A protein has these predicted regions:
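Short, structured helix-loop boundary elements
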Residues: 12-13, 33, 55, 59, ...
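Alpha-helical DNA-contacting segments of helix-turn-helix folds
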Residues: 51, 58-68, 72
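Amphipathic alpha-helical segments used for helix-helix packing
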Residues: 88, 100-120, 137, 170-174
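Short hydrophobic/aromatic patch on the recognition helix
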Residues: 41-51
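Basic, helix-initiating cap at the start of DNA-binding domains
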Residues: 1-26, 30-39, 56
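Amphipathic alpha-helical packing segments from all-alpha helical-bundle domains
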Residues: 67-74, 100, 119-146, 152-159, ...
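Solvent-exposed, amphipathic alpha-helical segments
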Residues: 14, 18-25, 68, 72-79, ...
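Hydrophobic alpha-helical connector segments
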Residues: 60, 74-103, 157, 161
Length: 200
C-alpha cells in the first residue's frame, strides 16, 4: 500500500517538476501536455490520472510556489524581533514576497496574479493539518489589532490584501504599471496598515 502510494506521489511530483521547468523555460502557453509527459518520462495517459488538464497543473504549481514564498517570508519575518505589531509584520511578509518575485521574474510569470492561500475551510476542517497556516492564524488571532473580528473576517481581509499586493506586484514588476514597484510599495503598505489597524 505504502509502496504503491509512494510511486503515485513520485509520478505526480515528476509531472509537476517537469511542468515547472518547462513553464520557466518557455511559458505555459507554449508548453503542451505531451511536452510535460516527455520531460517527466511518463506515458501521456499517466498525466490524466493526476491532472484534468494543463490548467490543473498550473494551479497545483501556483499553490506550491505560493506556499514556499509564504513559508520563506514568515521564517524571515520571525527573525525581525523589532517588529512589534501585526500590521508591520504583515507588511514585512508581503515585502519579502515581492522582493523574491522581483528578483526572479520567471517565477512571477508562473505565479501570474494568482497567489494561492490555503482555504480557511481546510484549516477549520482539520486543526492539525497545514501547520504553516495554523501557526499564522494563531499569530493573527492573538494580535490586539484583530480583536473583535471573527476568523473568517480576518481571513477574508488578509487574503484580499495579499491578492491586491500580488496583482500590483505582477503589473508593476513585469509591465511597469501603474508605476514601478518601488513607487507602488508605499501606497500598498499604507493600504495594508490602514486595513489592519485596531478597530475603535
Amino acid at each position: 500500500m505504502g509502496t504503491v502510494e509512494g510511486k503515485k506521489q513520485e509520478k505526480r511530483r515528476a509531472l509537476l517538476e517537469a511542468a515547472y521547468d518547462l513553464f520557466l523555460e518557455r511559458g505555459a502557453a507554449k508548453t503542451s501536455v505531451e511536452d510535460i509527459t516527455s520531460r517527466a518520462k511518463v506515458a501521456k495517459g499517466t498525466f490524466y490520472l493526476y491532472f484534468q488538464d494543463k490548467g490543473a497543473v498550473m494551479q497545483a504549481l501556483q499553490g506550491r510556489v505560493s506556499y514556499q514564498l509564504l513559508s520563506d517570508a514568515c521564517e524571515a519575518v520571525e527573525k525581525q524581533t523589532e517588529l512589534e505589531n501585526f500590521p508591520d509584520k504583515m507588511v514585512a511578509v508581503i515585502d519579502h514576497i515581492i522582493e523574491a518575485l522581483r528578483k526572479d521574474t520567471l517565477v512571477l510569470k508562473v505565479l501570474e496574479r494568482n497567489f494561492i492561500w490555503p482555504g480557511l475551510d481546510q484549516i477549520e476542517a482539520s486543526r492539525e493539518a497545514e501547520p504553516l497556516m495554523r501557526k499564522l492564524l494563531n499569530v493573527v488571532l492573538t494580535s490586539p489589532e484583530m480583536a473583535g473580528r471573527t476568523e473568517r473576517e480576518i481571513y477574508q481581509r488578509i487574503t484580499a490584501l495579499g491578492s491586491m499586493c500580488m496583482s500590483v506586484c505582477y503589473s508593476s514588476v513585469l509591465e511597469g504599471k501603474p508605476d514601478d514597484i518601488e513607487a507602488m510599495k508605499p501606497v500598498l503598505y499604507d493600504i495594508v496598515r490602514r486595513s489592519l489597524k485596531a478597530e475603535k
